[in-house]
Swiss-Prot record:
Domain Globin: 2-147
Family annotation (SUPFAM superfamilies): Globin-like
Amino acids binding heme b: S45, K65, H94, K97
Protein name: Leghemoglobin 8
GO cellular component: cytoplasm; nucleus
Family according to the record: Belongs to the plant globin family.
Main location: cytoplasm
Localization (cell): Cytoplasm; Nucleus
Organism of provenance: Medicago truncatula (Barrel medic)
Subunit comment: Monomer. Interacts with CAS31 in the cytoplasm; this interaction leads to its protection from denaturation under thermal and drought stresses.
Description of the deletion phenotype: Reduced nitrogenase activity in root nodules.
Expression tissues: Root nodules.
Amino acid sequence: MGFTEKQESLVNSSWESFKQNLSGYSVLFYTIILEKAPAAKGMFSFLKDTTGVQDSPQLQAHAAKVFEMVRDSAVQLRATGEVILGDATLGAIHIQKGVVDPHFVVVKEALLKTIKEAAGGNWSEELSTAWEVAYDGLAASIKKSMS
């Protein structure tokens, strides 16, 4: 079964909720990542020389880009059934930063926990599944571009 219109709608509405508190949700997202994978701190230039996760324009911009790419993946999955990367350099950047498969799992977990917080009372298994499928499509495309 393909990505449904309802799944796309769920991702879009929770993406809008995420954007309402970009600062807070960005900090939460990276805090969860670093709790699970402390060594990943060095992969992010905006976190390298900080104690903990400090809000910054770079942190917000990167978090917004990650979540927006997942949202765009939902749109693509609904329209065409596949995810085509808009940025051909993503694979090379991930290789350069030393990203490996377990990092994708950590980011997925952080993304879902952050969206759960952003969605509040609208959180559901259906919403979780929509974000999971969209993220998995994006991750698969990034991994493919890394090979």
